[in-house]
Amino acid sequence: MEEYRGELLAPAGTMDCLKAAIAAGADAVYLGFSGFNARTSAGNFDADSLKEAVRFCHVRRVKVHVALNTTVYGTELAPLADAVRAVAASGADAVICQDLAVAKLIGEIAPELPRHGSTQMSVHTLQGALELKDLGFTRVVLARELSLPEVEAITRNCGIETECFVHGALCMCVSGQCYMSAFLGGRSGNRGSCAGPCRLPFEANPLPEGRPGRLHHLSLKDNSVIDKLDRLQAIGVASAKIEGRLRTPEYVAAAVNACLAGREGRAYDRDLLKNAFSRSGFTSGYLDGKIDGTMFGVRSEADAELTRKTLPALRELYRRERSRVPVKMKLEIEEGGEKLTVTDADGNRAFAYGDAEPQPARTDPTESLQRSLSKTGGTPFAVEKIDVEMDGGPWFVPGSAVNELRRTALEGLQQKRETLRPWPVQEVELPPLPQRTLPPHRTLRARFESWDQVPEQALSGLEALILPIAQADRVPRAWRSKTILELPRVMFGALEADTARRIAATQEAGFAGYEAGNIAHLRMCRGLPLSGGFGLNVTNQLSAQFYADHGLNAILILPEVKDSDIASIAPVQNGQPVPTGVIVYGHMPLMVTRACPLQNIHDCAHCDKTGLLTDRKAKKFPVRCGMGVRTIYNPVPIYMGDKPGALTVDYGVAYFTLETREEAAAILDSIRQHAPFEGEFTRGLYFKGTN
């Protein structure tokens, strides 16, 4: 039996890319369903073209994974349900999803359709992967930032398939936690419309006021770990994924070709792969655990020129149909005619009958007949075995007649393989969206980065304080009953175990509860008082209700959601409303990153864990390092303190990060008094929304 080498999964932004991937040798493709995938500017597929794609792939033993991996607004839930039905009708092999509303609808409409957790779910820990398993997911796409030992620890213990990116672009931010494109331009990366701001100038060097940044200190080189495919395979990774649904057929074919060679231990043309697309080379820093300034790079004009010169050679990689479906043939010849039977490994069978009058042969024609039947070039089929039976022979059959038998039988087999096999669907009626009214008393919560920021009179007029769990020991016992401990949105390396220890140490310490920022926290805090932070990316009623059903006692709505959509989010628990909230003040964390942009100018030994990034408009974005990650903040804070009735929620959160204790006290006073903000501020996306 042939050794299973794991799935090679290629991007298919268009039908041309899909065909290039298959011709180059991909085992599976992933593509986006129009309107609900994380690459809206790719070609994408509607209900009809998806069926065409599935037919084309399934004939060739290639699986199709459909991306429905965006956050969804309430008004989109009905079209989303239609999209789920369309995917089920196509017979595609799996759905990749981010929003738990998508997962919930698949479970209700097409419960047998496999669900894969998108990298947009920010799963980077064993606890997160185990939670997805409990929720019925069959595969998780792991975060790109993981090292090989971290991938291994998850893969060997999570009980579901893991999928890892092995080649292609690297986002600067942890996927699913990037809000930069949305807040700077209204194009949400969580909704597939990222404008790519990290490819623009953001300079870490200290610059005087007014001078624009010119260097690209947020731009990472493309990831390439093809040389480590054998190690990923050895630890049990089920799927090696190539990123690039916005790339060309030539790029797709080059990446597939290189990955096939890497998987089989063969040499591949590294220069050809680099010339297909690179940003001044590749990096394997994350998987190697070597995260430093060498990971950064930009696409130069020289890179683009090399790509243009290499296009003819790249096109040769997918010019011919690859014979990849093994078939067995049986040719029966008797005095009255011929019969050819063709079968594949999936149990499909096709027949062809000839009316050529066989003539007695002087010598045994078996080898000649087998040679004619084995000529399957230009088709998806490769002959594995040919049996020839002659009743009363030997018989001579003209080559043209044998060729016609072969063509007819293979066409019949192809038609059978093209037959769609839809997933069973159930009738599901979506409940009408709730329309909340403004509660009579909206409360205020305040989140602080450090206990040093907390004003002495902070509890006055506040429903709750929120502090990172690492600050728990600093909270006086008298304050703890109103203090919620925030869990880190990202827990790379030892931080997952450290967070678990801190949860265990604080359970009986008198705190009000915990705030989740990642799906892993549901499992880590099972049975404990738990609310939801913005890192859960709640944007609609179904996802909010999911979290309420799993025990969350309050939910902070993602600040990308528009006011009218906020009003339709009203989860309940045991018949009682679950409070929802919004950020009413704060420098929005636009990115959380594992690679450090400050390493472009100095190493960690010479860094005080703070910095500024200056963009091309001379705006300065604060950077703070801690807990194994770097957070990049919006230089302009959200402020809604003077608009107390604008957003239909139960509580507001003043989200303090960069402020001093005195500044925090003054801002809290302004919010309580509904006073205008003194200084530059933004209303965020509450009134204009995103794409």
Tell me what each language-model feature is.
Residues K104:
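A cross-family signal for key residues in well-ordered alpha-helices
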Residues M1-A24, A28-R39, A53-V54, R60-A88, ...:
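Surface-exposed amphipathic alpha-helical tracts and adjacent flexible/coil segments at the periphery
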